[in-house]
Amino acid sequence: MRKFGMVLLALFLALPVRAAEQGERRKVELPEMMKQHMLSNMRDHLATINQIQALLGQGKLDQAGDVAEERLGMSSLAAHNAAHMAPYMPPEMQTTGTEMHHAASRFAMTAKEGDLPRALESLSHVTTQCVACHAGYRLN
């Protein structure tokens, strides 16, 4: 009986997530080539966050900061060619993306201070923007 209760609880907790997945995200229309470019950028962002987490786990906070600034921070914008996609993005989506890049630059500075708990908290501000964007928008 206890197992049954746990299964019911898990299903109950999963319902809001499923409801959010089903249609509350705003569709963003992009030409196919730009859509693929944006998806590629987002996959690179995810791989970068993975690399940063590994470096933090190894105690290499300076390196984690360098990677963050180079690949996610404000310094990375030219490499991502994001400016040509901005006109296709809703203003709120642009703001969320820009805030992610600012948060990554702030993380880079925090990581270089060498305080792992503060660096991890700062990194969460980067991923908060990722979560917000993915919860609110869907490329079409």
Name every feature range the model reports, one short phrase each.
Residues 20-140:
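Sequence context surrounding c-type heme c attachment/ligation sites in exported
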Residues 9-10, 52:
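Enrichment for repetitive, rod-forming helical segments
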Residues 1-8:
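Bacterial N-terminal signal peptides that target proteins for export
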Residues 10-18:
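Hydrophobic h-region of N-terminal signal peptides that target proteins for export
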